Swiss-Prot record:
Subcellular location: Cytoplasm
Pfam families: Thiolase_C, Thiolase_N
Principal cellular location given in the protein's record: cytoplasm
EC number: 2.3.1.16
Record pathway: Lipid metabolism; fatty acid beta-oxidation
Catalytic reaction annotation: an acyl-CoA + acetyl-CoA = a 3-oxoacyl-CoA + CoA
GO molecular function: acetyl-CoA C-acyltransferase activity
Protein name per Swiss-Prot or TrEMBL: 3-ketoacyl-CoA thiolase
Function: Catalyzes the final step of fatty acid oxidation in which acetyl-CoA is released and the CoA ester of a fatty acid two carbons shorter is formed.
SUPFAM superfamilies the UniProt entry points to: Thiolase-like (SSF53901)
Amino acid sequence: MGQVLPLVTRQGDRIAIVSGLRTPFARQATAFHGIPAVDLGKMVVGELLARSEIPAEVIEQLVFGQVVQMPEAPNIAREIVLGTGMNVHTDAYSVSRACATSFQAVANVAESLMAGTIRAGIAGGADSSSVLPIGVSKKLARVLVDVNKARTMSQRLKLFSRLRLRDLMPVPPAVAEYSTGLRMGDTAEQMAKTYGITREQQDALAHRSHQRAAQAWSDGKLKEEVMTAFIPPYKQPFVEDNNIRGNSSLADYAKLRPAFDRKHGTVTAANSTPLTDGAAAVILMTESRAKELGLVPLGYLRSYAFTAIDVWQDMLLGPAWSTPLALERAGLTMSDLTLIDMHEAFAAQTLANIQLLGSERFAREVLGRAHATGEVDDSKFNVLGGSIAYGHPFAATGARMITQTLHELRRRGGGFGLVTACAAGGLGAAMVLEAE
């Protein structure tokens, strides 16, 4: 095993996660239709602070992320500070690491705590797929800039005359990789074919995710970590995630057609995460600061790792790459884990990563390691369901997973939990959590 890297401050304090909260997650254009991500972020941070009863001045830093950014609010973190009654002097900045954005936010706050520049901070993320930055064509954008510089009406009219009808059409945000033009679903199809993952296996994982998420809500396990949202026109509260299909059957999944490779594909809307709106955040502190305030931490951040691979082929292998690093830095193995929570971008991606974590050949030939990371024990894996069921507001998913895993660890009497995710751009993230 490689070098263990303890996550402690200069005084030897562990990094404590004292509280976490999220909004219910909503499918695109449903409960949060028209609510921008910045307002979702304000909603969850304001409620998180109110529930924790931590004085606003105790929070010295807020690091927040948004993947689909709005031009009018480029620093969502600062807008949240200014819009929630937090101390105006609170340091705030925004981060983006695609689907691992709130993993990055947590890591950044942890690094500030370890450096000793702060003693308490908030990390999280929010995204809205219902309020999108609809742009204009490149040609129209260039003409508009030139028109602004033109001095006479005739010059302006001449510039506009260069435009054609198609140049005036609105341009939605890109859903494909900038460097390759591949959509995430195209990559999921690649992975299904590369690793021999069948449609039946994908549908079974998706069904499992929905069944377990529905059971978690039914058992009341999520009530403490999901706030009630009140949104215009305030006719009724929004209480639970609205994507979960608790009454579905495997036969229902089999009815859907492939969404990306129409002829030979196996990836469908049902075995993929839907476009989703929501926000999530966690409060981190040094262990000694939590004790001073009389707070009992949910748990501790034991280690983290970020990785990057090529984007042209099977780029959603982040968990298979980042997990061994995070475990190594924590001084643990897969068998030491009580829980494993992997982001389910697609069932195909999830199953491919599970396969490679247990592959000796992948470990030797690709990772350059002597042995496989370890088999994933199904009894420990995504025990409350995953992103296919809950949905995936890109920047919020990591904070959801961290909070959910820590609560479940505490229900089980403590232990170690792994949270891990793939992300666009061939990125990967993994964190090891500890609860007592």
